[in-house]
Amino acid sequence: AVFTVVNQCPFTVWAASVPVGGGRQLNRGESWRITAPAGTTAARIWARTGCQFDASGRGSCRTGDCGGVVQCTGYGRAPNTLAEYALKQFNNLDFFDISILDGFNVPYSFLPDGGSGCSRGPRCAVDVNARCPAELRQDGVCNNACPVFKKDEYCCVGSAANNCHPTNYSRYFKGQCPDAYSYPKDDATSTFTCPAGTNYKVVFCP
């Protein structure tokens, strides 16, 4: 699958992509094409902001930093909005979503690209940061309750692993971005599928 990542934000982002792609700077209006093989799983694309890197590609980002390197090999640090995917899985389908489980830094859309007969995908185009609850504000953006409070009921682990429900915080995020994962058991309204072989477009600030 080809993923076209487009920065429509009025500022520079440093796009990141694992396990394929790594990372690169995207000025306003620039795009980046990433080819991911069928069978790729646990994949993420995200935007890093406020980055400074030296000529060797080392430095740091205010949001989404992945260990201080331009070329990410591991996931980014919360808070950051995530575009997630797994290719050619059950029933020959691709599964994809936008997650704000790790918080929110930049609005995204994640849509099928081209004429595969598949047209639905998630959009989280609202600036969640503008109305972020004060206790979730971090680095000028909006974190989720799980990374902030590390409690079972927010993270759906431990005592809440099998009995996890929306919280006031996840309902806030869901109200802002109905398509996005707002808490870990939010699968029903947040996972999208297309036939394997579909190409996709991820737009920052759609």
UniProtKB/Swiss-Prot annotation:
**A Gene Ontology biological process annotation?**
killing of cells of another organism
Which keywords, in A-to-Z order, does the entry hold? Answer: Antimicrobial, Disulfide bond, Fungicide, Plant defense, Protease inhibitor, Serine protease inhibitor
Question: What would be an example GO MF term here?
Answer: serine-type endopeptidase inhibitor activity
Q: Which InterPro entries match?
A: Osmotin/thaumatin-like_sf, Thaumatin, Thaumatin_CS
- SUPFAM superfamilies associated with the record: Osmotin, thaumatin-like protein (SSF49870)
User: Which superkingdom heads the taxonomic lineage of this protein's source?
Assistant: Eukaryota
Q: Detail the disulphide connectivity of this chain as listed in its UniProt entry.
A: C9-C205, C51-C61, C66-C72, C118-C194, C124-C177, C132-C142, C146-C155, C156-C164
Family that this chain belongs to: Belongs to the thaumatin family.
Q: What does this chain do?
A: Inhibits both trypsin and alpha-amylase. Inhibits the growth of some plant fungal pathogens.
What is the protein name stated in its UniProt record?
A: Alpha-amylase/trypsin inhibitor
Species this chain originates from: Zea mays (Maize)
